[in-house]
Amino acid sequence: MINAKTKVIGLIGHPVEHSFSPIMHNAAFKDKGLNYVYVAFDVLPENLKYVIDGAKALGIVGFNVTIPHKIEIMKYLDEIDKDAQLIGAVNTIKIEDGKAIGYNTDGIGARMALEEEIGRVKDKNIVIYGAGGAARAVAFELAKDNNIIIANRTVEKAEALAKEIAEKLNKKFGEEVKFSGLDVDLDGVDIIINATPIGMYPNIDVEPIVKAEKLREDMVVMDLIYNPLETVLLKEAKKVNAKTINGLGMLIYQGAVAFKIWTGVEPNIEVMKNAIIDKITK
């Protein structure tokens, strides 16, 4: 029941109408008996500068941040957690005692989702497509104990991110951390991860980022997109019987970590998952 004491948490991005985060978080708040509500705010890039001051004025207690604001939002925050500083992107904000503090739960969320499906991810050869906020978080997390190739349409961005990861994590650039265009050679690659919006609702019938002929049965193909659950990339992967992982797990795990940051309470993962599955299957 929403009343005068209800605490508000928001999602800021553009667009946001495709998001399942409100469904997932509101189900988790209800399950834990917490007087919170989660609302999606469609924020145009030119209005981002007003968000934090506006939120403080209104008493909003936190946010998730999604495309395209994960990097740009950082300049408006009072403090940034060390992991988010390292990654150079923020996806979670807590506002407490007049301070807006930025965190990043994307990287750990992706790892948790991946390891839930295939076990410990260590010493693997991984290609990450994209060089934006989500790609940064996942790449920094997985580069700690795996070999990474950043593949991006704009090769200069891939190179810059690969160099930054190698430098910050003390990895060998050109060996442990590499870069490429989208036509990356997948020989010897164990896992590929799509961290671009290619294939995301409503543009679900686009050309996949990788075609089936470049994929193998012994690969793991993960797409961070969760709407649709089966993207064009995952359809291609199924043609060669590769292991596929959609973006639902990462959405839930990054959300669960954010939930704990805002409330101090561990959410019920199954409640979050079932709320989304109910929505998708209706």
Swiss-Prot record:
Active site location: K70 (proton acceptor)
Binding site for NADP(+): 130-134, 152-157, 196, 200, 224, 247
Residues the record lists as binding shikimate: S19, F20, S21, T66, N91, D106, Y226
Endpoints of the signal sequence: none
Gene3D superfamilies: Leucine Dehydrogenase, chain A, domain 1 (3.40.50.10860), NAD(P)-binding Rossmann-like Domain (3.40.50.720)
Catalysed reaction equations from the record: shikimate + NADP(+) = 3-dehydroshikimate + NADPH + H(+)
Pfam families, per database record: SDH_C, Shikimate_DH, Shikimate_dh_N
UniProt pathway: Metabolic intermediate biosynthesis; chorismate biosynthesis; chorismate from D-erythrose 4-phosphate and phosphoenolpyruvate: step 4/7
Biological processes per GO annotation: amino acid biosynthetic process; aromatic amino acid family biosynthetic process; chorismate biosynthetic process; shikimate metabolic process
Keyword annotations from UniProtKB, A to Z: Amino-acid biosynthesis, Aromatic amino acid biosynthesis, NADP, Oxidoreductase
Source species, domain of life: Archaea
GO molecular function: NADP binding; shikimate 3-dehydrogenase (NADP+) activity
InterPro entries: Aminoacid_DH-like_N_sf, NAD(P)-bd_dom_sf, SDH_C, Shikimate_DH, Shikimate_DH-bd_N, Shikimate_DH_fam, Shikm_DH/Glu-tRNA_Rdtase
SUPFAM superfamilies per UniProt: Aminoacid dehydrogenase-like, N-terminal domain (SSF53223), NAD(P)-binding Rossmann-fold domains (SSF51735)
Enzyme Commission number: 1.1.1.25
Role: Involved in the biosynthesis of the chorismate, which leads to the biosynthesis of aromatic amino acids. Catalyzes the reversible NADPH linked reduction of 3-dehydroshikimate (DHSA) to yield shikimate (SA).
PANTHER family reported in the protein's UniProt record: BIFUNCTIONAL 3-DEHYDROQUINATE DEHYDRATASE_SHIKIMATE DEHYDROGENASE, CHLOROPLASTIC, SHIKIMATE DEHYDROGENASE
Protein family membership: Belongs to the shikimate dehydrogenase family.
Subunit structure: Homodimer.
The protein's name in its UniProt record: Shikimate dehydrogenase (NADP(+))
Organism for this UniProt entry: Methanocaldococcus jannaschii (strain ATCC 43067 / DSM 2661 / JAL-1 / JCM 10045 / NBRC 100440) (Methanococcus jannaschii)
Gene: aroE
